[in-house]
Every structure is written in C-alpha cells, then in structure tokens.
Swiss-Prot record:
It comes from the Viruses. It is a single-pass type I membrane protein. Residues 1-17 form the signal peptide. This is Spike glycoprotein. This protein forms spikes on the surface of the virion. It is responsible both for the binding of the virus to susceptible host cells and for inducing the uptake of the virus by the cell. The interaction between the internal components of the virion and the portion of the glycoprotein exposed on the cytoplasmic face of the plasma membrane probably directs envelopment and virus budding. Glycans are attached at residues 93, 385, 501, 512, 541. One of its GO terms (cellular component) is membrane. Belongs to the nucleorhabdovirus glycoprotein family. GO terms for biological process: symbiont entry into host cell; virion attachment to host cell. It is found in: Virion membrane. The chain crosses the membrane at residues 560-578. The gene is G.
Amino acid sequence: MSHIMNLLVISFVLAGSSWSLLGYQDDFSSKRSGALASNPTYNLPQDKGYGRDMYQPYYICEPDNDGSALTLPSWHYSCKESCMGNHLKRVVNITGARWNYVGISIPVFKIVTNEVCYTSHENVWGYCSQYQISRPVATQKSDVSCITSSMWDNDKSPIGSLYNIVNSNEAECDYFSDITDCNRDYQIFKREGKLIKRSDDSPLELSIVTDGIRTDPASEYLSLDDVSWFWKLPNNDMSPPCGWEKTQKLSCSYTDTTDVIKCNSIGYTYNIQGISKKSTCAGNIYDTDGPFPFFYDAEEALMSTDDACGKAKQGKPDADIAFIEGVNRAFEDLELTYCSATCDLFARQGTPNEDHVLDTPIGTWRYVMRDNLDPALVPCLPTSNWTISDPTTICHGKDHILVVDTATGHSGSWDTKKDYIITGEVCNTNNDEMGDDYDGMRDKILRGETIEIKFWTGDIIRMAPPYDNPEWIKGSVLFRQNPGWFSSVELNKDMIHTRDNITDLLTVMVQNATAEVMYKRLDPKTMKHILFAEIVDGVGNVSGKISGFLTGLFGGFTKAVIIVASLAICYIVLSVLWKVRLVASIFNSAKKKRVRISDILDEEPHRIQQSRPTLSRKKKTRESIQMLLNDI
C-alpha cells in the first residue's frame, strides 16, 4: 500500500511540474512573481547589500557625556508629550551645515620600528651560520633623526612614498663563542596631514585621515602603541581655509513641553538642552560637533489638530460637523494610544550595554549607562555615508577599524560590534582601549596566531596564517538588520559593504601589517637543511684551508700537487671498492653452495661421503677471504 501511495505522490508532483512547463498557473502565480520582483530581501543570495548581510555602520551618534544625552525619565516624558495633539507645536526651519576635510596641507611621517637581532654560530667545521629575531618596538622621539632633509621636500619625496632604513647587519663570527648584534630598522610612510579649525573658539587640529589621527599640531610628535608620527609646522600663517558649507533646508517640529526638536526628513532628533551656537568662518552654526550641524533660519506656529478641525467645520451642516469631530477624536485617540504605548515600551526595555540603535516615536536613539550609573538615551543620525576606508587599518581597542565619511572626507573609528559610530572618535581618542588591538594584531602575526574580528550582525571573520584565505563564521544574534534604516537614508549598491568586499579589505589590512612586522624575516630551515648546509659548507671551508696551506707550502706548483694528490686518493678509493666487491661476490657464491645439517642427516651414506669434498672447499674459501681481508 505504501508503494502505491509513493507512486501516486510522485505522479502528482510530475503532473504539477508538467502543468507548470506547459504554462498552466494558479490564481496567485502573478502575485508571487510580483512580490519576488519588488521585495529586495529576496535577492539576498545574489545581492547581499539589502538586509542582514551588510557590514558597515548604520548610524552616527553623539558621545555619552557631551550634554546631548537625555536621562531615561526625561526622554520618556518628552516622548509621551510629543504624542499629545493638543500641545503647542512649532515648525523650526533650519539649513544643514557640512564641515569638509579642508585645511593647510603638511607632510607627516609615520614610522614603524623593528628591532632586528642577528646571532652568529661557528661549528667545528668552521662554518658560520646566522640566526635572526625580529620584533616591533616603540618608536622614540629621538628616532626622528632617521628622516632625512630630502624626505621633507615634497618635490623629491611625494605623498605616499615608502622608505626602508636598514641598520641591522649579520653578526661577526667567532670560533669560540656566539655573537649577537641588534639594531633598529625603520619603515617610514609619508602621509598628508591637514591643519583644520572647526569654529573660532576651537583649537587648531592636525588631521591625518589615512591613519584616523586627530591631534594637537604643536607637539610635532605623536606616539600610539609602537608607531609614531612626526611633522613640522609651517613658519608662515596657519589660518586654514573655511571648510563649512550649506546643504539642504529642513523643516523640523518642536513641542513646547518637550526637550526635543524632531526632524523627520533625516530621522534625527536634537536635545535642545545640549545644542549650542558657535561662531565659525561661515557664520553662527548650532551643534558644530554633532552628527548634523545646522544654521537656524526661522520658526513658525504649527496648526494644531483642534485648529485644523475648526477650519474644516466652517460652512458645514451640523451632521457633517458631528462626523468630522467624531473622526478627529477617533484618530487622535488611536494615535495617542499607539504613540504612548510605544514610548512606554522603549522606556522599559533598555539595557546598559545596548549595541544597537532603536527607532522610537521621537527618532533614533541608543541606550547608555553614564558615569553616575544613571541610564540615558543619546540621539543618533541614520547614515549611509560612513564606509570602511580603503585601505583600512585597526584603530584603538578590539574590533575597531578605520572608516571614512564619503561626503566630507573625514575619518573615524568604528567598533564593528556596534551598528553605529560616535562623533569625534578617531583612532587616537579612546585611551581606555589603546594598545589592545593593533599592537595585539602585530604580536599575533609574529606568533602565527589566528586573528578574529566580530561584527554587530554576530558574524566573525577569522584569518589564520598566512592570512590570505579568511573564513566567515555565521553568528546568531537577535538584531541582524534594521528595516527602519532603509527608509531613512539614500542608498545604492556602490555605498554598501558586502561580505566579499569586507573580506578583500581586511585581507589587505592584515597582509600590510604582516609586511611591516616580517619585512626582513629569514626563511625557517629544518634540522636536515641546517646539517646539510653545515656539512657541505664545512667541507668546503676545510678544503679551502687545505688549499691555502698547500699554496703557502708549494707556491706555484700548488695545482700540480693537488692534481697528483687527487689522483692518488681516487686510486686508493677505487682499489678499496674493487676488493670489497670481490669479497662480496665470494660470500654470495659460498652462500649458494652451503649445505644444511638437517639435509645431510636425511641423506643416504653415499651422499654423505660425496659431500666431504664440499666441506673442504668451504674451508679453503674461508682462508681465501681471510687473506683478502688482510690485504685490505
């Protein structure tokens, strides 16, 4: 019976397939094809940019303690008040401001220092071998002397130049002791630095966008982990050009009982308690250090729902007025209930270590636990402009890599375990995490260990020596995508990082670090190779000494003496080999004629008598062998 059922099922499947091939479709075929064509998430296997397989920061957020954060009770109150339709609301018109990467260009030198030690060992043959140990060491301020005057000249040394200064050499050889000689070798990379100034009262800064560095230019020196940067300030005027420019105009809303200004068109909300006006080269700009600085234009009253309802009732009969009022109250109650309930939900679900930004009724925010252990929320701006720098590098702290703003050219640091970056955070700003990452990666490369980088999607990229074939490990986390982000940003496929793109970028990053660490490392040799080299080179060394001795003894007849001696040695060796071969052949013939005792006892008496001459011949054979051995 079961076989019959299986045949029926197979027949049904085949029949359905044939109907599809013949063009027969059900009533929902067109709807299925339409959904597949319009929904980009169905294209994940081929186009991984839409959805859970994007590897880049989704948001840029304010720092935890810069005044932009709202305490959880304040945020909850502002969220609930924004839901009320009877409060006074105003429209705030602003113009966005963008601070571009513009400044005075100066040359900057990044120096990577390696201590290279050679140890010599001379064996009994007189053969000298060299063993090398190379390790990264901190670059000192005195190492600036390795930068020559021609390197500072941009005409002779363009930006992007690489110099290898090698001071290490093989150690001298000594027959009675091993000698170790250590020296410092330098790799010097020429970068472009720019002197920039954000506002009139802000200090002058030096930005090295290639390395994600922003620092005080007056020191002319910066050390981070075991790498250092050197530069010289120009003697002339250091007033940088203006980097501010105006962008799009926005209309934002403000409720008089709240702490927030909400700009729905960009998905960002300002905390009015934390924004301030600063004078710049382009005029007065608000929130100059925030994700979206702006020029204030004007504001006007926003018509309330009650005013809109009153306007709609003008000239209407009583029946229509009652209907309008009823519909208005229903929508107000529905919106208030939904909005307030969502505010309550977000206020109760926060955790201090939240690594993901949340979409709320009043914009996108992230949870933080401030120094006073008071939970708060920080505003965040959805963005698709921040992408991984090419080439990239490891910044401070574990899983921090260099990113760049494609709109302005500024660089920053991204903790890949989070779906956001923080304004103003670059590769040398987080002192708590310094020394745990790039230095650790270099040490891991020296030890031949595996390097792992974890992303906020839960996925991990694992790179094992020789670091040219990364492996992806699929993660399992609750938040792997944020659908609301796609509706808040302008996005195209050229702006996204897929898994293949990340693989290429990080592989190049690790290989560049490997080249810095192991640029002069000797190839390892097995014991077999070492012994072979010592024997061959040792014999050659002994031969050379013998040749020198004979040259001193016989003068111009040295070659003739060496030829005669070589012929004599060859004659002796061939004579010995011939006699050994003769002995071996005698042994083999004797072995073939050997008679076993058990065979002799089983033979008839006449066979025993016939075998006696054979035994006597064996005796003579042994005597002959002994004579040959004596001759040898």
